[in-house]
Amino acid sequence: YDLIPILEDFIEEHPDFSYKGARAIIAFTGYEGILGYRTAASYSDSPNYEQDREQAAKVAQCLKDNGWELASHSWGHLWMGVSSVPGETFKISDERFYTDTDKWEAEVESLIGPTDIYIYPNGNDVADWRPYTEDNYRFKYLHSKGFRYFCNVDASKPAWIQKGSDHLRM
């Protein structure tokens, strides 16, 4: 959580560092809430639950107003994609995939606003290296939720980019 003031202080001292006021991308999970606030539905019995949700939404808006991009990192930081085990297709069931995506929409997007950036947890993409196709129902579901930029975090593999007609994968 110290990243934000550190980068803001640096940009204040070095304004040429930030192209057109851009900052960084902050990717959110939701299973423990966001931005230090207990916003997950599992905390709904807390006397501060609604206040925490309101405050988190204000902080998220402030970040966006100041050039920060906000992204999804899934709700539960699950292995969303392809399994490396022979004979297995995906790491988690379809039901868990859909539930996780819907929880993120309900518990995180409802506070930070829509985003078109999805950063795969654990670098676990919903497909192998081949371009996404219409047959990939997990990609189609994420796409239907408004995601257009699909990012991997697996630094153990060489960097690559695929440009689809309406999405970018990297």
Residue ranges and their predicted role:
Residues L35-Y49, H77-S93:
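Surface-exposed cleft-lining segments at the edges of enzyme active sites
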Residues G81-M170:
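C-terminal active-site subregion of NodB/CE4 polysaccharide deacetylases
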Residues H14-I25, K64-A71, S110-I117, K145-F150:
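Loop/turn elements at helix/coil->beta-strand transitions in domains of secreted/extracellular proteins
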